[in-house]
């Protein structure tokens, strides 16, 4: 009975959290004789994908389980199911070691059988023979790389970084066997496939390895992340199999990462997430031979050449094949790699797939100031599309000096930006002239938990509307409420409280001046009163912060998720009154269980609140020879945004946003209810109550299920909050050798008073105004 109850509870969790998971489980248990090796599906929906090889004219890869998947050029199927490995894999009863199938490496034996090097965290690597005719998987050898592969507490952590099989030997690089080694320093071992012996060859910053000839290997060398060198090197190196000595063959770009290494004949083929690259004998030059839908690169992801195509897998773009005989595109756009993530990155990949005539390469820049960008835009490393965060000083300076192309020529692009929240676009859309496309917005604000407010006897009238009222509430809580209400914390994660509050007060004052159209000033009475209050609380805030830190380190601090509108949190039955890491978002506005609301704060009483926002914008380098193609890409990004992304940036989109998983989830719930109802009909009377409870819970969940991910009501609430977001334009605290920033440090270090700070800051602002005039 107890076991049945737990089982039904597990089924219910699967039903609510993993649509489709239980249906598959039920389907497979209905008929144990079902040949699951013939199931066809897109296995690259899975997050983890390992080594990839060609055998018998087909492509094989390792996925979670382990599972061997086969691709025949059109469809994927599971060629070797996880159950085939159950008798040969090692399993730790006490959890002292674990396996890592996505670091396993496939090779092909002379008879077409797959060979697999399968690693474990305790330094053991099994050589498995994996037939493709549903015969048993067998263990050929079990290699132990080191007898001493544990740290002081006995836990094991060996991690396989690279491996290759060639002739009678396998070579592997592993990290973690030397507890004193710096990050990236791997040990290279030779495994004798005939007698099962192990020989350490060398220790170096080499990860991926490939066979070169009878005496040498090719390795990917990367010492950039050691922190021990002023001369970072990323290169292909030749490794002597006997001595381990290396010599550099071909240096590669130090700002890039690489993955998908494979041999094609005598050439090394790999990618940087954007380009397919080849290094041919004598291995001294990197050449581009194709372009991928660009994505972020993880070094250990697989690659394989099959026929005329290069196959690679990436977590963001899935499986991609590139015809290596196709001509290279005439236009290649270099764009800022900072947008390779998220929705913008997805749209860039989508554009690349739809426009093979345009190659897209992600590249980075260390520029942060206008002079830095100016120099970069005129160099050989210049980008066609740059990304900027606002607020900041570089974008406005480059815009005003004519370094950014005007984009108003694209009517679709202009229309998309014109309909966005005007408080977000003031710096990119100036007097009808468009200079950039906003692609991302983020905010930071305080929130207050109304449930905690009620618990401690406070009312809506006690909710702060100014920063001075917020400081008074914090002061009162620390003074009076801490002892009276120990079950509630004042706030979540109070790190650097004085500096955090000071920065928010300064930004709010700037935002209010800009919103009012006033000359920037720091002499307003309300501002000075707020700053004086903060100054008087600094020691008290530090003491509270120190006490909170001690409690947190001792495990005494946990929070309820209902108390947070964003940011991080722990979970328990109680929540804090305040969160300093809240944000404005449709997702949080739509959370029906949240008892937290954002605080709309101002400096002046009865003034519109100012929530400080940040936006990422994309702008075209005016000097680019591909400016038109870059503008076409920006137009594509603007027009093809999802409904959710449009709603985030524009008040014009308020329609309900459909949940793409609604029908699947609904069918799954109905299927679970049907299966449980059938099972209940033949269950013992003692079990029926558990079935009824599980069915009722699923029925309730089905009733609550909505076809909409976000409703018009959610979006309108978000829109009303976004009206208070400000992207400040003042650059008083930005730029190198900034005098105002130096002044802030002197004040926060306690070297000057509030009056001295205000007086000096006023002088700096007046000088800036005179210079700009």
Give a label for each model feature.
Residues 24-69, 163, 176, 207-209, ...:
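Conserved N-terminal structural module of periplasmic/extracytoplasmic solute-binding proteins
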Residues 28-41, 67-95, 125-149, 183-202, ...:
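Surface-exposed loop/turn elements that mediate protein-protein interactions on large endomembrane-trafficking
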Residues 390-445, 597-604:
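Hinge/lid segment of periplasmic solute-binding proteins
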Residues 405-420, 463, 510-531, 603-609:
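Short, solvent-exposed loop/beta-turn-alpha elements that line the ligand-binding surface or hinge
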Residues 435-439, 444, 468-532, 570-577:
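Extracytoplasmic/periplasmic solute-binding protein
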Residues 474, 516-566, 588-604:
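Glycine-centered hinge/linker elements that transmit conformational signals in sensory
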Residues 590-670, 678-681:
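Extracytoplasmic/periplasmic substrate-recognition and gating elements
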Residues 675-770:
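C-terminal capping/gating helix-and-loop segments adjacent to ligand/active sites or protein-protein/ligand interfaces
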């Amino acid at each position: 009975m107890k076991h049945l109850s737990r089982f039904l509870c597990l089924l219910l969790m699967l039903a609510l959290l993993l649509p489709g998971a239980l249906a598959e489980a039920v389907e497979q248990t209905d008929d144990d004789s079902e040949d699951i090796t013939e199931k066809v599906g897109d296995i690259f929906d899975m997050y983890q994908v390992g080594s990839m090889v060609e055998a018998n004219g087909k492509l094989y890869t390792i996925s979670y389980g382990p599972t061997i998947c086969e691709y025949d050029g059109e469809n994927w199927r599971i060629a070797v199911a996880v159950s085939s490995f159950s008798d040969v894999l090692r399993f730790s009863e006490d959890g002292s070691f674990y396996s890592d199938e996505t670091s396993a490496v496939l090779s092909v034996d002379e008879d077409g059988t797959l060979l697999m090097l399968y690693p474990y965290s305790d330094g053991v690597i099994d050589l498995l023979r994996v037939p493709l005719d549903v015969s048993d998987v067998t263990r050929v050898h079990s290699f132990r790389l080191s007898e001493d592969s544990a740290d002081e507490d006995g836990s094991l952590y060996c991690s396989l970084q690279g491996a290759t099989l060639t002739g009678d030997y396998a070579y592997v690089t592993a990290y973690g066997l030397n507890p004193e080694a710096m990050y990236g320093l791997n040990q290279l071992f030779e495994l004798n496939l005939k007698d099962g012996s192990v020989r350490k060859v060398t220790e170096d910053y080499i990860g991926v390895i490939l066979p070169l000839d009878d005496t040498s290997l090719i390795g990917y060398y990367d010492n950039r992340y050691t922190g021990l060198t002023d001369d970072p090197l990323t290169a292909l190196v030749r490794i002597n199999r006997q001595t381990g000595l290396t010599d550099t063959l071909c240096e590669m770009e130090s700002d890039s990462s690489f993955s998908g290494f494979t041999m094609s004949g005598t050439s090394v083929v790999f990618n940087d997430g954007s380009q397919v690259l080849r290094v041919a004998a004598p291995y001294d030059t990197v050449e581009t031979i194709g372009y991928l839908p660009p994505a972020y690169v993880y070094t250990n992801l697989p690659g394989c050449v099959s026929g005329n195509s290069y196959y690679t897998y990436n977590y963001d773009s899935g499986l991609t094949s590139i015809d290596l005989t196709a001509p290279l595109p005439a236009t290649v756009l270099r764009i800022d790699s900072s947008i390779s993530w998220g929705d913008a990155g997805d749209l860039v990949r989508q554009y690349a797939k739809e426009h093979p005539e345009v190659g897209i390469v992600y590249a980075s820049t260390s520029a942060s100031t206008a002079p830095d960008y100016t120099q970069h835009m005129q160099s050989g490393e210049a980008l066609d599309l740059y990304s900027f965060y606002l607020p900041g000083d570089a974008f406005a300076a480059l815009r005003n000096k004519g370094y950014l192309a005007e984009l108003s020529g694209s009517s679709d692009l202009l229309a998309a930006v014109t309909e966005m929240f005007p408080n977000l676009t003031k710096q990119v859309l100036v007097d009808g002239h468009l200079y950039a496309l906003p692609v991302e917005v983020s905010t930071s604000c305080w929130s207050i938990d109304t449930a905690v407010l009620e618990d401690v006897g406070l009312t809506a009238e006690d909710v702060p509307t100014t920063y001075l009222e917020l400081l008074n509430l914090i002061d009162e809580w620390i003074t009076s409420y801490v002892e009276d209400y120990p079950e509630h914390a004042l706030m979540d994660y109070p790190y650097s409280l004085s500096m955090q509050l000071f920065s928010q007060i300064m930004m709010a004052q700037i935002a209010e001046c800009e919103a009012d159209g006033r000359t920037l000033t720091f002499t307003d009475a309300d501002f000075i009163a707020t700053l004086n209050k903060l100054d008087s609380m600094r020691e008290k805030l530090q003491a509270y912060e120190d006490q909170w830190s001690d409690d947190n380190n001792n495990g005494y601090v946990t929070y309820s998720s209902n108390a947070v509108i964003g940011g991080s949190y722990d979970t328990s039955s109680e929540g804090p009154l305040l969160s300093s890491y809240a944000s404005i978002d449709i997702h949080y506005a739509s959370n029906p269980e949240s008892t937290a609301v954002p605080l709309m704060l101002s400096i002046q009483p009865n003034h519109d609140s100012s929530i400080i926002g940040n936006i990422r914008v994309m702008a075209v380098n005016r000097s680019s020879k591909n400016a038109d193609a870059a503008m076409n890409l920006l137009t594509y990004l603007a027009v093809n945004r999802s409904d959710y992304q449009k709603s985030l940036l524009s008040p014009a989109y308020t329609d309900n946003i459909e949940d793409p998983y609604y029908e699947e989830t609904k069918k799954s719930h109905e299927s679970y209810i049907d299966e449980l109802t059938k099972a209940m009909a033949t269950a013992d009377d003692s079990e029926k109550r558990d079935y009824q409870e599980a069915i009722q819970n699923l029925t309730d969940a089905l009733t609550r299920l909505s076809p909409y991910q976000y409703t018009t009501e959610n979006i309108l609430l978000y829109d009303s909050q976004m009206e208070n977001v400000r992207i400040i334009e003042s650059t008083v605290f930005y730029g190198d050798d900034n005098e105002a920033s130096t002044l802030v440090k002197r004040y926060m270090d306690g070297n000057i008073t509030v009056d001295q700070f205000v007086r000096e800051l006023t002088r700096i602002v007046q000088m800036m105004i005179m210079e700009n005039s």
